[in-house]
Amino acid sequence: MTTVYAWVDSPLGELLLVGEAEQRSGSAAGGGAGATAGHGLGAAGDGLGADGGAEVRLCSLSVPGQKGGAVVRDGWRHSPEAFTEIAGQLEAYFAGRSTRFDVPIAPGIGTEFQRRVWEVLESIPYGRTVSYGEVAARVGASGAGVRAVGTAIGRNPLLVVRPCHRVIGADGTLRGYAGGLERKKLLLGLEGVVG
């Protein structure tokens, strides 16, 4: 497995995308028979992406200065080609032409509780918001569990794609966002939620 990364320009600043590339068995790049087109993030050309023989799954999408955001590490491969598909989806989202993302996500990231919370985030429709308490109720947490839900939301490694910006305070105020409240306001404004 190879860790790949790229930077993508956006209204939030330069986004850092990190993924895991794994060679598909029987792929054209591997010389196997019966190769099929995959669902990787990128394009052909460097052995990564949809037709390059490797499937790339998104691990992280961070904004500049993000609390707990990914940082490029030694041994990671800079591979913008691996992220062609997600870059296009992000561009369409920021241009108002798309309301959802369809990208493969790396499995096994986060605790079981965090993954349950993140699944709720993925179910929040574009242009809608829910409270931290509503998320807690959906995962079966109550009372003090709201704090744990807030912590899990704050550790979401896939900003924008997994829309934690759609979670607000019970009183309608914007609270906590690893990328900063100004970016949360920008995203909700883009979706027509705040002016």
Would you name each region that the model predicts?
Residues 170-195:
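…primarily DNA-binding HTH/wHTH and HhH modules…
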Residues 1-143, 194-195:
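Basic nucleic-acid-binding alpha-helical/helix-turn surface characteristic of O6-alkylguanine DNA
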Residues 161:
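Major-groove DNA-recognition helix of helix-turn-helix-type DNA-binding domains
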Residues 145-149:
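Helix-turn-helix DNA-binding helix
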Residues 156-157:
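Terminal helix-turn-helix DNA-binding modules in bacterial transcription factors
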Residues 164:
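Short cysteine clusters
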